[in-house]
Amino acid sequence: MPISIPKGEKLMDLLSMKGKVTIVTGASGPRGMGIEAARGIAEMGGNVALTYAGRKEGGEKNAAALEKEYGIKAKAYKLDVANYESCCQLVKDVIADFGQIDAFVANAGKTADSGVLDGEISAFEEVIQTDLLGVAYCAKAVGHHFKERQTGSFVITASMSGHIANFPQEQTSYNVAKAGCIHMARSLANEWRDFARVNSISPGYIDTGLSDFVDKETQKLWHSMIPMGRDGDAKELKAAYVYFCSDASTYTTGSDLVIDGGYCAR
Protein backbone atom coordinates (compact mmCIF):
# COMPACT_ATOMS: atom_id res chain seq x y z
CA MET A 1 0.00 0.00 0.00
CA PRO A 2 1.27 3.51 -0.77
CA ILE A 3 2.28 5.73 2.14
CA SER A 4 -0.85 7.67 3.07
CA ILE A 5 -1.49 11.40 2.98
CA PRO A 6 -1.26 12.95 6.48
CA LYS A 7 -4.45 14.04 8.23
CA GLY A 8 -3.06 17.39 9.36
CA GLU A 9 -3.82 20.53 7.36
CA LYS A 10 -1.92 23.28 9.16
CA LEU A 11 1.86 23.46 8.85
CA MET A 12 2.44 23.30 12.59
CA ASP A 13 0.33 20.14 12.76
CA LEU A 14 2.40 18.55 9.99
CA LEU A 15 5.66 19.51 11.71
CA SER A 16 4.47 18.35 15.12
CA MET A 17 6.30 15.38 16.62
CA LYS A 18 3.90 14.95 19.55
CA GLY A 19 3.21 11.30 20.31
CA LYS A 20 6.18 10.19 18.20
CA VAL A 21 9.47 8.59 19.17
CA THR A 22 12.73 9.32 17.38
CA ILE A 23 16.13 7.67 17.80
CA VAL A 24 19.09 9.97 17.17
CA THR A 25 22.50 8.29 17.10
CA GLY A 26 25.66 10.18 17.96
CA ALA A 27 23.99 12.75 20.21
CA SER A 28 26.18 12.76 23.31
CA GLY A 29 28.31 15.80 22.53
CA PRO A 30 27.82 19.27 24.04
CA ARG A 31 27.31 20.63 20.54
CA GLY A 32 26.82 19.02 17.17
CA MET A 33 24.33 17.82 14.61
CA GLY A 34 23.07 14.92 16.70
CA ILE A 35 22.06 16.92 19.75
CA GLU A 36 20.59 19.68 17.55
CA ALA A 37 18.50 17.13 15.64
CA ALA A 38 17.27 15.75 18.96
CA ARG A 39 16.59 19.26 20.25
CA GLY A 40 14.56 20.09 17.15
CA ILE A 41 12.44 16.96 17.65
CA ALA A 42 11.96 17.81 21.32
CA GLU A 43 11.00 21.40 20.50
CA MET A 44 8.21 20.00 18.34
CA GLY A 45 6.97 17.81 21.21
CA GLY A 46 8.59 14.51 20.27
CA ASN A 47 10.18 11.96 22.58
CA VAL A 48 13.80 11.11 21.83
CA ALA A 49 16.21 8.24 22.40
CA LEU A 50 19.80 9.45 22.20
CA THR A 51 22.82 7.21 21.72
CA TYR A 52 26.42 7.49 22.79
CA ALA A 53 29.48 5.38 22.01
CA GLY A 54 31.78 6.24 24.91
CA ARG A 55 30.44 9.45 26.44
CA LYS A 56 27.76 8.03 28.75
CA GLU A 57 27.80 11.12 30.95
CA GLY A 58 27.30 13.37 27.91
CA GLY A 59 24.42 11.30 26.58
CA GLU A 60 22.63 11.18 29.91
CA LYS A 61 23.23 14.90 30.49
CA ASN A 62 21.74 15.77 27.09
CA ALA A 63 18.72 13.53 27.67
CA ALA A 64 18.06 15.06 31.08
CA ALA A 65 18.38 18.59 29.69
CA LEU A 66 15.88 17.89 26.91
CA GLU A 67 13.38 16.41 29.37
CA LYS A 68 13.68 19.40 31.68
CA GLU A 69 13.47 22.08 28.99
CA TYR A 70 10.77 20.62 26.74
CA GLY A 71 8.76 18.33 29.01
CA ILE A 72 9.25 15.30 26.78
CA LYS A 73 10.62 11.84 27.50
CA ALA A 74 14.28 11.33 26.65
CA LYS A 75 16.74 8.57 27.43
CA ALA A 76 20.34 7.80 26.49
CA TYR A 77 21.53 4.40 25.26
CA LYS A 78 24.96 2.97 24.56
CA LEU A 79 25.43 1.99 20.91
CA ASP A 80 28.27 0.60 18.84
CA VAL A 81 27.04 1.32 15.30
CA ALA A 82 29.80 -0.86 13.88
CA ASN A 83 28.17 -3.88 15.55
CA TYR A 84 24.89 -5.12 14.10
CA GLU A 85 23.83 -6.88 17.31
CA SER A 86 24.28 -3.63 19.21
CA CYS A 87 21.99 -1.87 16.71
CA CYS A 88 19.35 -4.59 17.11
CA GLN A 89 19.56 -4.36 20.90
CA LEU A 90 19.08 -0.59 20.72
CA VAL A 91 15.87 -0.99 18.73
CA LYS A 92 14.58 -3.63 21.17
CA ASP A 93 15.40 -1.47 24.19
CA VAL A 94 13.78 1.67 22.77
CA ILE A 95 10.60 -0.22 21.84
CA ALA A 96 10.49 -1.68 25.36
CA ASP A 97 10.93 1.76 26.95
CA PHE A 98 8.89 3.94 24.56
CA GLY A 99 6.50 1.48 22.92
CA GLN A 100 7.36 2.34 19.32
CA ILE A 101 9.83 4.02 16.97
CA ASP A 102 8.52 6.52 14.43
CA ALA A 103 11.76 7.98 13.10
CA PHE A 104 15.44 7.11 13.16
CA VAL A 105 18.24 9.63 12.56
CA ALA A 106 21.42 7.75 11.64
CA ASN A 107 23.87 10.46 12.60
CA ALA A 108 26.76 8.72 14.40
CA GLY A 109 29.95 8.92 12.39
CA LYS A 110 33.71 9.22 12.29
CA THR A 111 35.97 11.63 10.44
CA ALA A 112 39.09 10.67 8.47
CA ASP A 113 42.53 12.12 9.16
CA SER A 114 44.48 10.58 6.29
CA GLY A 115 44.33 9.47 2.69
CA VAL A 116 44.70 5.99 1.25
CA LEU A 117 48.48 6.01 0.86
CA ASP A 118 49.49 7.92 3.98
CA GLY A 119 47.10 6.19 6.38
CA GLU A 120 46.78 2.70 7.82
CA ILE A 121 44.35 0.31 6.17
CA SER A 122 42.77 -0.20 9.59
CA ALA A 123 41.93 3.53 9.71
CA PHE A 124 40.27 3.32 6.29
CA GLU A 125 38.26 0.29 7.36
CA GLU A 126 37.17 1.93 10.61
CA VAL A 127 35.68 4.93 8.79
CA ILE A 128 33.84 2.71 6.29
CA GLN A 129 32.64 0.43 9.09
CA THR A 130 31.29 3.32 11.16
CA ASP A 131 30.02 5.76 8.55
CA LEU A 132 28.64 3.37 5.94
CA LEU A 133 28.10 -0.11 7.33
CA GLY A 134 26.93 1.33 10.64
CA VAL A 135 24.12 3.14 8.82
CA ALA A 136 23.15 -0.07 7.03
CA TYR A 137 23.09 -1.95 10.35
CA CYS A 138 20.81 0.68 11.89
CA ALA A 139 18.54 0.60 8.84
CA LYS A 140 18.19 -3.17 8.95
CA ALA A 141 17.63 -3.16 12.71
CA VAL A 142 14.79 -0.62 12.64
CA GLY A 143 13.44 -1.44 9.19
CA HIS A 144 11.62 -4.54 10.38
CA HIS A 145 9.81 -2.44 13.00
CA PHE A 146 8.84 0.14 10.39
CA LYS A 147 7.51 -2.58 8.10
CA GLU A 148 5.52 -4.17 10.91
CA ARG A 149 3.92 -0.83 11.79
CA GLN A 150 3.65 0.25 8.11
CA THR A 151 5.13 3.64 8.94
CA GLY A 152 8.50 5.22 9.64
CA SER A 153 11.11 7.73 8.56
CA PHE A 154 14.82 6.93 8.30
CA VAL A 155 17.11 9.94 7.99
CA ILE A 156 20.82 9.61 7.24
CA THR A 157 23.42 12.25 8.02
CA ALA A 158 25.50 12.12 4.86
CA SER A 159 27.81 14.99 3.82
CA MET A 160 28.67 17.33 0.99
CA SER A 161 31.77 15.10 0.87
CA GLY A 162 29.52 12.52 -0.75
CA HIS A 163 29.08 14.95 -3.64
CA ILE A 164 32.59 16.37 -4.02
CA ALA A 165 36.19 15.51 -3.11
CA ASN A 166 37.30 17.86 -0.35
CA PHE A 167 40.44 19.96 -0.73
CA PRO A 168 43.14 20.18 0.52
CA GLN A 169 42.71 17.48 3.18
CA GLU A 170 42.93 13.84 2.15
CA GLN A 171 39.88 11.90 3.34
CA THR A 172 39.03 9.34 0.68
CA SER A 173 37.50 6.89 3.15
CA TYR A 174 35.08 9.51 4.48
CA ASN A 175 34.12 10.73 1.01
CA VAL A 176 33.44 7.19 -0.17
CA ALA A 177 31.39 6.36 2.92
CA LYS A 178 29.22 9.46 2.63
CA ALA A 179 28.66 8.97 -1.10
CA GLY A 180 27.50 5.48 -0.21
CA CYS A 181 25.13 6.90 2.40
CA ILE A 182 23.47 9.15 -0.18
CA HIS A 183 22.91 6.26 -2.56
CA MET A 184 21.84 4.02 0.32
CA ALA A 185 19.07 6.50 1.09
CA ARG A 186 17.90 6.43 -2.52
CA SER A 187 18.06 2.65 -2.68
CA LEU A 188 16.27 2.10 0.63
CA ALA A 189 13.62 4.64 -0.39
CA ASN A 190 12.77 2.33 -3.27
CA GLU A 191 13.06 -0.85 -1.19
CA TRP A 192 10.85 0.51 1.61
CA ARG A 193 8.45 2.45 -0.65
CA ASP A 194 5.32 0.74 0.72
CA PHE A 195 5.85 1.50 4.40
CA ALA A 196 8.61 4.03 5.18
CA ARG A 197 10.47 7.03 3.84
CA VAL A 198 14.26 7.34 3.61
CA ASN A 199 16.16 10.58 3.02
CA SER A 200 19.60 12.02 3.66
CA ILE A 201 21.02 15.37 4.71
CA SER A 202 24.41 16.49 3.39
CA PRO A 203 25.93 19.14 5.66
CA GLY A 204 28.96 21.16 4.67
CA TYR A 205 31.53 22.48 7.12
CA ILE A 206 29.60 22.68 10.39
CA ASP A 207 31.15 23.93 13.62
CA THR A 208 30.75 20.84 15.79
CA GLY A 209 34.26 20.57 17.20
CA LEU A 210 35.14 17.48 15.15
CA SER A 211 37.40 19.51 12.85
CA ASP A 212 39.16 21.49 15.58
CA PHE A 213 42.31 19.43 14.98
CA VAL A 214 42.66 20.93 11.47
CA ASP A 215 45.13 23.83 11.30
CA LYS A 216 43.74 27.35 11.02
CA GLU A 217 45.25 28.02 7.59
CA THR A 218 43.43 25.03 6.14
CA GLN A 219 40.20 26.19 7.75
CA LYS A 220 40.69 29.64 6.21
CA LEU A 221 41.09 27.96 2.83
CA TRP A 222 37.80 26.11 3.40
CA HIS A 223 36.05 29.39 4.13
CA SER A 224 37.43 30.94 0.95
CA MET A 225 35.70 28.17 -1.03
CA ILE A 226 32.33 28.60 0.70
CA PRO A 227 30.19 31.26 -1.02
CA MET A 228 28.69 32.24 2.35
CA GLY A 229 32.21 32.58 3.76
CA ARG A 230 31.76 30.75 7.08
CA ASP A 231 31.12 27.44 8.81
CA GLY A 232 27.54 26.52 9.53
CA ASP A 233 26.15 26.29 13.04
CA ALA A 234 24.61 22.93 13.96
CA LYS A 235 21.32 24.62 14.89
CA GLU A 236 20.98 25.62 11.23
CA LEU A 237 20.34 21.94 10.45
CA LYS A 238 17.71 21.01 13.02
CA ALA A 239 14.76 22.21 10.92
CA ALA A 240 15.84 19.84 8.16
CA TYR A 241 15.82 16.88 10.54
CA VAL A 242 12.38 17.84 11.85
CA TYR A 243 11.08 18.15 8.29
CA PHE A 244 12.26 14.69 7.27
CA CYS A 245 11.11 13.04 10.52
CA SER A 246 7.67 14.66 10.57
CA ASP A 247 4.48 14.45 8.52
CA ALA A 248 5.57 17.61 6.68
CA SER A 249 7.61 15.40 4.34
CA THR A 250 5.26 12.48 3.69
CA TYR A 251 5.70 12.85 -0.09
CA THR A 252 9.48 13.15 0.17
CA THR A 253 11.63 10.04 -0.08
CA GLY A 254 14.94 9.25 -1.75
CA SER A 255 15.98 12.90 -1.46
CA ASP A 256 19.26 14.41 -0.32
CA LEU A 257 19.25 17.92 1.13
CA VAL A 258 22.58 19.74 0.80
CA ILE A 259 23.16 22.35 3.53
CA ASP A 260 26.65 23.66 2.84
CA GLY A 261 26.60 27.44 2.50
CA GLY A 262 26.79 27.01 -1.26
CA TYR A 263 30.04 25.01 -1.33
CA CYS A 264 28.84 22.45 -3.88
CA ALA A 265 27.42 25.22 -6.07
CA ARG A 266 30.67 27.14 -6.44
From Swiss-Prot:
One of its GO terms (molecular function) is oxidoreductase activity, acting on the CH-OH group of donors, NAD or NADP as acceptor. Disruption phenotype: Affects the ability to produce liamocins with a mannitol headgroup. This is NADP-dependent mannitol dehydrogenase. It is an enzyme of class 1 (oxidoreductase). Liamocins have high bioactivity against the pathogenic bacteria Streptococcus spp. and can be potential new specific inhibitors of oral streptococcal biofilms without affecting normal oral microflora. Liamocins are also able to inhibit human cancer cell lines such as breast cancer cell lines T47D and SK-BR3 or the cervical cancer cell line HeLa. The keyword Metal-binding does not apply. Its EC number is 1.1.1.138. PANTHER family: BENZIL REDUCTASE, MANNITOL DEHYDROGENASE. InterPro entries: NAD(P)-bd_dom_sf (IPR036291), SDR_fam (IPR002347). The keyword RNA-binding does not apply. The active site is at residues 159, 174, 178. Induction: Expression is regulated by the cAMP-PKA and HOG1 signaling pathways via the transcriptional activator MSN2. It catalyses: D-mannitol + NADP(+) = D-fructose + NADPH + H(+). It comes from Aureobasidium melanogenum. The lineage of its organism: Eukaryota, Fungi, Dikarya, Ascomycota, Pezizomycotina. Catalyzes the interconversion between D-mannitol and D-fructose. Plays a key role in liamocins biosynthesis by providing the mannitol moity that is linked to 3,5-dihydroxydecanoic acid (provided by the HR-PKS PKS1) via ester bond formation catalyzed by the esterase EST1. Belongs to the short-chain dehydrogenases/reductases (SDR) family. Keywords: NADP, Oxidoreductase.
